């Protein structure tokens, strides 16, 4: 089981990359998975715990180290079931060391491909025949945004928001590089393992804004589609190929799905619902969830709140309702007729 996180990749740009289209043809692609928290630490801990931030302990930027001891996360569960586990991260505090045989981090601007290729090789060698779980964090988009964009433009610099096309063009170059990495790392994985028994999941933790909303230069400030709508691509011998679904899902659905795919039962309840049957048997019209929830509290911007979430939204396949706690304002959008969320109909 290999997770490949393409940090900051937007679901609505996947169509610009031939590399990603090629990968997409090899598996089942879900392009409407709502990130319960649209920034990396919060997002990944929801994915691995199957719990919302309020339940796993990490629901704010300031609570990076607050993962509850009373819960179990995916690497712990897999390790208890005989897996050798490893990860490479942008920062060693993104996920807890709990459940990892190898827990490492890379520096900003590192050679992600070489580092991840070496980690894969090391993991399979050290596993000595055990099944392997590896989490690879590709952070190019994050690195460039944090190191180049944020220092150059303050959140209230109007010039940034007035050059949306230029911002998106710059983003697309980074996105294409991320997809090129994804294709290359897939080849490395294929060369090392028995593809019959391997599941690869390419995923995004959140999208990256390009100046669509005043006050958000990257992500984590609001809960609009460009940052909370994410994608998951499942590839494996037992997974159907050339399937695409835009039915609504949530990141709390990922853990039960992965456990189902691994044939692992747990003795505790999870709020999400597995969609493993869709991956293996075929997409149905009614699969998915009726409602998905997302929340955030920004580090900067118009309504910074790093100590607790202060922007909340609930969405269906048709509508999204957002509550901005700090100014006490509501927004309602018709996602079918206004997918860019331009007209507040509240």
Give the positions of each predicted feature.
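Catalytic domains that recognize anionic headgroups
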Residues: 1-346
């Amino acid at each position: 089981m290999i997770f490949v996180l393409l940090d900051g990749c937007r679901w609505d740009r996947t169509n610009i990359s031939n590399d990603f289209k090629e990968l997409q043809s090899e598996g089942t692609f879900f392009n409407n998975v709502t990130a319960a928290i649209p920034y990396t630490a919060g997002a990944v801990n929801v994915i691995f715990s199957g719990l919302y931030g309020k339940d796993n302990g990490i629901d704010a930027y300031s609570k990076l180290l607050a993962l509850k001891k009373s819960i179990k996360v995916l690497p712990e569960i897999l390790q208890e079931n005989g897996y050798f586990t490893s990860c490479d991260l942008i920062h060693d505090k993104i996920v807890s060391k709990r459940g990892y045989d190898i827990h490492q981090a890379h520096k900003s601007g590192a050679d992600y491909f070489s580092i991840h290729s070496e980690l894969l090789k090391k993991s399979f060698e050290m596993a000595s025949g055990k099944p392997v779980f590896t989490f690879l964090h590709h952070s190019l988009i994050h690195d460039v945004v944090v190191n180049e964009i944020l220092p150059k433009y303050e959140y209230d610099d109007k010039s940034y928001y007035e050059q949306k096309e230029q911002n998106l063009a710059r983003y697309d170059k980074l996105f294409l590089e991320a997809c090129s990495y994804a294709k290359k790392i897939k080849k490395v994985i294929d060369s090392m393992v028995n593809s019959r028994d391997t599941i690869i999941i390419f995923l995004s933790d959140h999208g990256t804004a390009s100046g669509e909303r005043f006050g958000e230069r990257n992500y984590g400030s609001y809960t609009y589609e460009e940052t909370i709508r994410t994608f998951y691509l499942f590839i494996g011998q037992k997974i159907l190929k050339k399937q695409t679904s835009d039915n609504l899902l949530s990141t709390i659905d990922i853990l039960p799905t992965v456990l189902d795919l691994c044939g692992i039962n747990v003795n505790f309840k999870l709020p999400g619902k597995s969609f493993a049957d869709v991956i293996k048997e075929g997409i149905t019209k009614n699969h998915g969830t009726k409602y998905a929830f997302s929340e955030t509290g920004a580090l900067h911007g118009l309504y910074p709140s790093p100590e607790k979430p202060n922007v909340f939204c609930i969405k269906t396949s048709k509508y999204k309702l957002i509550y901005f706690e700090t100014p006490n304002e509501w927004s309602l959008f018709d996602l079918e007729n206004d997918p860019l969320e331009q007209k507040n109909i509240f």
